[in-house]
């Protein structure tokens, strides 16, 4: 038996007047997820345990079979692993976004989805001016970068994700608590460096949002993980364009597969991700495929973009995987789900349970659910489960098939 988890990041949503009271999942054309639902078992997954913020770090850790209560130490250390940045015992890694501020407001958490090439120049300029022996900036992908601070600086600071406070006053959401004085000075110090940079002057002239400030959040120390194979007896791989997910894979001892054209955005190589996933199962037992596009559309508050991202995920990822599975001599158990909702109206994450379907090429047992959406799955025979139990549940169902 081979095991596949397909994650449409942020697909779940709330009803919208603009969609006649439907959610994006209900409105979108998703024949492949619906077909899986008609021929599989449905339920709701709690990927964000009570007491945790609904970040993609916590939610995807759960989906990949790890209880956040046992393994979570922060988002940025996972991203550091993906970027090949070593963390010493007392090092604290921070996510460092390039953001857009305008008239004292945080107007864009992604600096207009700035290119990685542009962003590298900006982060290198900030590091040259503000970096030191105990503070190092590392360029990453698009707007997603890292700051590593030594000696535990800011480990317990209260840092707010910028996508949670779009159109909020920058001064109302600056870091607070331990180490916040240093972090605040870095943010303030980055603004004159970035606002006058030729990269941003060019972006503004082209009508694009500039990356005119850095912003810190998601900090933590390096975590300690048991490997996925140790936990479940399965070898596996992870496919994503997002450093966070790749970092989870590294700590879990999974192979991290880089797919050409995978961008972490609406223009990603959906089909390539699915094809690489199926190829990986020739010598592995398990693969997780993560697609970021629906989440990005939710953060933008863009209804049409989210509908398109969901439909692309269904057609090009789920559809490609289903066709390959049915044509194969292998047996497969496949789960499809979001990690968390990213409601268009809120433009940020929420914590409620998300719909999931479990489909097997062997199993004849089905329930009465026919469409993949937030409401229909409430009637699913699998009920409400903890996300971190899904891998074990997949294995148990496979044994019963």
Swiss-Prot record:
Keywords: Glycolysis, Isomerase. CDD domains: iPGM_like (cd16011). It holds the Pfam family Metalloenzyme. Gene3D superfamilies: Alkaline Phosphatase, subunit A, Metalloenzyme domain. Disulfide bonds: none annotated. SUPFAM superfamilies: Alkaline phosphatase-like. GO terms for molecular function: metal ion binding; phosphoglycerate mutase activity. It catalyses: (2R)-2-phosphoglycerate = (2R)-3-phosphoglycerate. It comes from the Archaea. InterPro entries: Alkaline_phosphatase_core_sf (IPR017850), ApgAM_prokaryotes (IPR023665), Metalloenzyme (IPR006124), Pglycerate_mutase_ApgM (IPR004456), Pglycerate_mutase_ApgM_sf (IPR042253). One of its GO terms (biological process) is glycolytic process. Its EC number is 5.4.2.12. Pathway: Carbohydrate degradation; glycolysis; pyruvate from D-glyceraldehyde 3-phosphate: step 3/5. Belongs to the BPG-independent phosphoglycerate mutase family. A-PGAM subfamily. Catalyzes the interconversion of 2-phosphoglycerate and 3-phosphoglycerate. This is 2,3-bisphosphoglycerate-independent phosphoglycerate mutase. It comes from Methanococcoides burtonii (strain DSM 6242 / NBRC 107633 / OCM 468 / ACE-M). The gene is apgM.
